[in-house]
Amino acid sequence: MPPHKAPRSSPQPLPAPVPPPSKPRPILLLFTGGLLAYLTSHLLAHFNILTVPVPNPDYIHKEPLRIVAVGDLHGDYANALAVLRMAGIANRKGEWVAGRTVFVQTGDIVDRGPDTIRLYKLMQNLSEQAVTAGGKVIPLLGNHEVMNMMEDYRYVTPEDIESFGGLEQRKRIWGRDGWLGKYLRTWDVVADVNGTIFLHGGLHPKWAHHGIPSLNTESQTYLQTLPPSELYHVPLFGGDGPLWYRGYAQDDERVVCKTLQEALSALKAHRMVIGHTPQLSGEILSRCGNQVLVIDVGISSVYGGNRAALEIVGDRVVGVYEGRREVIAE
């Protein structure tokens, strides 16, 4: 991979979000709450119970000729649309123009910026239009989507709240019965597209051995059945879970590449594509011999407005940037 180029701007790194703390509560509620999430997790695993919703049956997608993936958008519609246009996914009106392409967005559409509603509406519209054209949109949950379902608003901007009509209206819309809450609770946390694993943070072997269908079923079940306060106790949404884990992006490659290989072997996959950890250089980060690619390049203006997308066609992997394309693997 070529040396990183300097970004157009040099914003000061923002504090990395931390997993939401467990909320203090009376000991009886702590027992019932924490135990509820724990028992639900282990009952699902032990008895292979599929409570609603049933997982997406085509979590492994074998048909696409072209895959495009884009990382964290964080409330910035203008830069998000610019990246989608640059990658040949949408036109200036936000309409699907990618034909049979499979487009994956790896989560964190919300927080840090004001354009939450516009961005989720864009994803809805592109999803519908892609199907008509023979393509597919795969939107995945990020930690910030789940934080908002937990009613953890540490990174929500005043402009975002105002766009929903106030905090209480925002809570209602994000809730299990709100239009946005219902929509997001159908999203998966992990997808396998032709042997490339896509997710937000990173899939540690601890979770990879569960299998993708189980992870997606558990996530959707928790989000559709547990109240916000109980989501804090779900191990899947914890610091080493698929939404929060940063090891593949940050840890010493001499150690973490072995961990990555174990996870990929468990899934019979050859590559992992993740977001979550901003690359303020504006360049896609390749590690472990191109077996993991970090595509959070700081698209939102709060991180510098760096624009990049990942394109995979067969064995050829390319970073798509403004005015240039750089081959990562072939």
Question: What residue spans do the PLM features occupy?
Answer:
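Feature recognizes metal-dependent phosphohydrolase scaffolds
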Residues: P2-E330
